[in-house]
């Protein structure tokens, strides 16, 4: 069975990162804070998918990523392959362009992130490292 390739990005600004709250009605990972992103379409490369998802979900322009992936998760049971990058290289005013997917978005400090219900609790280590860099 082929894994569904999923890409996501952690948008950063000084001392804060952007997270999206997945709507409670979502089938996968409802009612948790997660990174903006989505599925790579057939024939699409991961970076183009990442740029498309940022534009669709947040109305911002992703100009690049800060090096290699900061997180990689493969879940054979759900046939998912998730790759996450971080980026300070984006522009535009971020807003929630798809409220049916995310019922809220927000900028958070490391202390605030520690109090959130994340899609995966192990994300906290990565997020703290990014904000301390």
Spans of model-derived segments:
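Short secondary-structure boundary/capping segments
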Residues: 1, 9-10, 24-25, 32, ...
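Conserved N-terminal beta-strand and adjoining loop/helix that marks the start
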Residues: 1-18, 39, 70
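Conserved Nudix-box catalytic region and its N-terminal flanking loop in Nudix hydrolases
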Residues: 16-56
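Nudix hydrolase/Nudix homology domain
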Residues: 26, 89, 99-133
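A short coil-to-beta-strand element that immediately follows conserved catalytic motifs
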Residues: 60-70, 85
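Active-site-adjacent beta-strand/loop module that shapes the phosphate/pyrophosphate-binding cleft
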Residues: 71-94, 106, 111-112, 129
């Amino acid at each position: 069975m082929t894994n569904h390739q999923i890409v996501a990005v952690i948008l950063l600004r000084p001392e804060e990162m952007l997270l999206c709250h997945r709507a409670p009605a979502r089938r996968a990972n409802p009612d948790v804070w997660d990174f903006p992103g989505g599925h790579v379409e057939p024939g699409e490369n991961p970076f183009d998918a990442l740029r498309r998802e940022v534009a669709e979900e947040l109305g911002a322009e992703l100009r690049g990523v800060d090096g290699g992936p900061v997180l990689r998760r493969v879940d054979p049971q759900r046939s998912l392959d998730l790759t996450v990058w971080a980026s300070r290289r984006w522009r535009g005013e971020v807003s929630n362009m798809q409220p049916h997917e995310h019922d809220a978005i927000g900028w958070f400090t490391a202390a605030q992130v520690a109090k959130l219900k994340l899609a995966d609790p192990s994300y906290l280590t990565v997020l703290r490292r990014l904000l301390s860099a």
